[in-house]
Amino acid sequence: YFMNNNIYRTLVKYEIIYDEVYEAFLKNGGEELDTAYVYNEGSCEKLLGEVLPTLSRPYTIATKVNPRITGKLNAEAAYMQVNESLARLRLDSVDTIFLHFPDPATPVEGVLGAMADLHDQGKFKELGLSNFPAWMIADVWHICDRHGWVKPTVFEGIYNPLTRKAEVELNDCLNNFGLRFYAYNPMAGGLLTGKYAKYEDEPTDGRFTHR
């Protein structure tokens, strides 16, 4: 599972040849490429749009709809971001589209209805949820079931030996509704690799940089 947020900055910083990195990932058994509308202000998706046609091995790809762009996770956000993401990626469809974060202030029916329409148009195969609490996952599933809309089948969330909240309630919810769990941040931002000699050391780049 290859996430394209922080890795993009590394590739640019060290002038690494992008397509060789992706080929190495696929050659060594990787299959799933993960990006998002907001990653590096769209640069990640544009980079993938350049690289994907050069890859010689099969892959699957996922992107995400984020409420922070329009200020709401609604139908407008879904249509705008899905279509722009596909244009950046130079694809007609992707394997999975995640709702990146929940938006408790906006009724979720609007974005779910739009995602169902986009799914019917063939823009993606699977609906995913990312960073949603268990109760909202259950709510989303039942709304989709009631309307006959595409249901979520995969969840993406933080999980590592230091961040284990998923074990309390989330895992049972995912098992109950049949969602796969893709964990991000498995090495706690590099903390578990021994990269930082002291807990007081501050990262100079990556997810946990003070910005």
Model-based region annotation:
Residues 26-27, 49-60, 83-92, 116-120, ...:
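Acidic (Asp/Glu)-rich catalytic clusters
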Residues 2-8, 68-72, 192:
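A short acidic, helix-capping loop that chelates divalent metal ions and anchors anionic groups
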Residues 58-70, 97, 156-158:
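A short, structured active-site edge motif that brings together acidic residues
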Residues 1-59, 92:
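N-terminal binding-site loop/beta-alpha segment at the start of enzyme catalytic domains
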Residues 25, 33, 48, 61, ...:
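Conserved, mostly hydrophobic/aromatic
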Residues 94-95, 100-102:
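Short acidic, glycine-rich surface-loop motifs adjacent to enzyme active sites
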